[in-house]
UniProtKB/Swiss-Prot annotation:
Chain ranges passing through the membrane: none
Protein's GO biological process: mitochondrial genome maintenance; mitochondrion-endoplasmic reticulum membrane tethering; phospholipid transport; protein insertion into mitochondrial outer membrane
Lineage: Eukaryota, Fungi, Dikarya, Ascomycota, Saccharomycotina
Domain of life where this protein originates: Eukaryota
Function description: Component of the ERMES/MDM complex, which serves as a molecular tether to connect the endoplasmic reticulum (ER) and mitochondria. Components of this complex are involved in the control of mitochondrial shape and protein biogenesis, and function in nonvesicular lipid trafficking between the ER and mitochondria. MDM12 is required for the interaction of the ER-resident membrane protein MMM1 and the outer mitochondrial membrane-resident beta-barrel protein MDM10.
GO cellular component: endoplasmic reticulum membrane; ERMES complex
Subunit structure: Component of the ER-mitochondria encounter structure (ERMES) or MDM complex, composed of MMM1, MDM10, MDM12 and MDM34. A MMM1 homodimer associates with one molecule of MDM12 on each side in a pairwise head-to-tail manner, and the SMP-LTD domains of MMM1 and MDM12 generate a continuous hydrophobic tunnel for phospholipid trafficking.
Protein's recorded name: Mitochondrial distribution and morphology protein 12
Annotated spans, Disordered: 72-119
């Protein structure tokens, strides 16, 4: 079953763009950057006009992990007294790591919930193919640390575009919260109609996720240096290193922050 996405409404939302930029910058602040790089941050983001292709492979009850975090919040007084009912345009995006792995059957780390569920709770396992025209602009300072530290500082502007993602993901709705997590990547010659999730056998799938999450199939990076001498090869080599660093960082962020058993969360939906 395929889903039609009102991508124009999502892509034109300033609130969503701001949340994504803030989230990316928060992640970049936590990344250990090379000594030749400083002040790296996202300056703008456009989601483009191409909507992702979404196909539902399984519908069922949300994983217990999503309820466990809800119970933890209730125990610490973090729950929303009004059930988080706020305007969708102001829904905060959070990152969460599953904290229930020691309470779950090791042979079935992602099992559907058998309790706690609210009346409208549900979960979709979806195939997402996103051949995008997204554009992310990043600014940074390129440092030349010879003959002294920060001897020269040059502004660098980078544009990330042509992102291609093909993945199996879980989207769960639990008590006015939406959880999104990537389960595994999908190769272009893989028969997703016969995937484990389509038959509901998520136990077999869960054992593969750690080694299979590499959802970025393509990412183009273009760079522009503020000023440099044409014959200064060391600077040009450093720019190439920045491009490689950014691509690796994006790949790692998706795996570490959104790959199961981690997820991002939208509240007040």
């Amino acid at each position: 079953m395929s889903l039609e996405v009102n991508w124009e409404q999502i892509a034109s939302s300033e609130a969503i763009r701001e949340q994504l930029v803030d989230w990316l910058n928060d992640q970049l602040k936590a990344v250990e950057v090379p000594k030749y790089l400083a002040d790296i941050h996202v300056t703008s983001l456009s989601l483009g006009s191409k909507a992702p292709e979404i196909t539902i492979r399984d519908i069922g009850k949300p994983f217990d992990d999503f309820y466990d975090i809800e119970e933890e919040r209730a125990g610490t007084g973090e729950g929303d007294e009004d059930d988080g009912r706020v305007a969708p345009t102001s829904t905060p995006m959070k990152h969460q790591t599953s904290g229930s792995s020691d309470q779950t059957d090791a042979s079935n780390p992602i099992s559907p919930s058998t309790s706690h569920d609210h009346e409208n709770d549900m979960q979709f396992v979806t195939e997402i193919k996103y051949d995008s025209d997204i554009c992310v602009e990043v600014a940074a300072q390129l440092l030349m640390n010879y003959p002294a530290e920060k001897f020269i500082s040059l502004p660098v502007r980078l544009k990330l575009s042509d992102l291609l993602i093909h993945t199996l993901a879980v989207v769960a709705y639990v008590n006015h919260r939406v959880f999104i997590s990537l389960l595994c990547d999908i190769s272009e010659n893989e028969d997703t109609d016969n995937t484990e999730s389509h038959s509901g056998n998520l136990r077999a799938l869960s054992s593969k996720t750690a080694s299979r999450i590499d959802v970025v199939k393509r990412l183009k990076v273009e760079s522009e240096l503020g000023s440099y001498e044409p014959d200064n090869g060391s600077i040009l080599r450093s720019v190439g290193k920045i491009e490689t660093f950014l691509v690796d960082t994006i790949r790692n962020l998706l795996v570490q922050e959104v790959g199961w058993p981690n997820w991002i969360e939208f509240q007040g939906v």
